[in-house]
Amino acid sequence: MYGTGNNAVTPDQAAASRADSLFAHAEGSISEDAILASARERSEEIGARAVTPAVGALLSLLTKLSGGKAVAEVGTGAGVSGLWLLSGMSYDGVLTTIDIEPEYLRLAKQAFSEAGIGPSRTRLISGRGQDVLTRLADESYDLVFIDADPIDQPAYVVEGVRLLRSCGIIVVHRAALGGRAGDPAARDAEVTAVREAARLIAENERLTPALVPLGDGLLAAVRE
């Protein structure tokens, strides 16, 4: 116990406070340019959840580490995550991004154009993520980013791992669900699906995973 009287805090409370401070520092340490800021504003206007700047910066880093010539994304939104992914890709890399909402794809296309990214570097596909992923070629992608309905995470993980080249990386956003995924008392459908996705990754001997506490939780894994 630290302090006295009403100001006393337990070691667990102190640790939680430090963790919150570190999280806030990490999330607030990344700035975005005007193009990303505009895409983020449009994302908020249409109610599409965009990755935080800190998550975006990590996506850019992981994409660069993967080689970044072929990247697939499920959950385009208004293009915020796509811009970050493209920033880490090679000059001739191609981003395949999938969303069921045509309006989201239109706004993402606008964001990519504003960033000076030519149409040959992006492939925007309208459709259900599960349906589109099954049509993509085995072992053809350096990185797969999943930022879609948590209910579908297990299916996306199965398909995403299939798409990875050797040393490719799969990244799953919303792996924490605001802390619910780690709460033993939480047993709803979303939590169950997210835990199943994490289990599939953890039990795959070809994958080396890590859970990163940024945004709503990033579960990343590299394929051997």
Curated annotation (Swiss-Prot):
It is an enzyme of class 2 (transferase). One of its GO terms (biological process) is methylation. Substrate binds at residue 147. Its EC number is 2.1.1.-. One of its GO terms (molecular function) is S-adenosylmethionine-dependent methyltransferase activity. Keywords: Methyltransferase, S-adenosyl-L-methionine, Transferase. InterPro entries: Cation-dep_OMT, SAM-dependent_MTases_sf, SAM_O-MeTrfase. S-adenosyl-L-methionine binds at residues 51, 73, 75-76, 81, 99-100, 149. Disulfide bonds: none annotated. Signal peptide: none annotated. Belongs to the class I-like SAM-binding methyltransferase superfamily. Cation-dependent O-methyltransferase family. This is Putative O-methyltransferase ML1075. It comes from Mycobacterium leprae (strain TN).
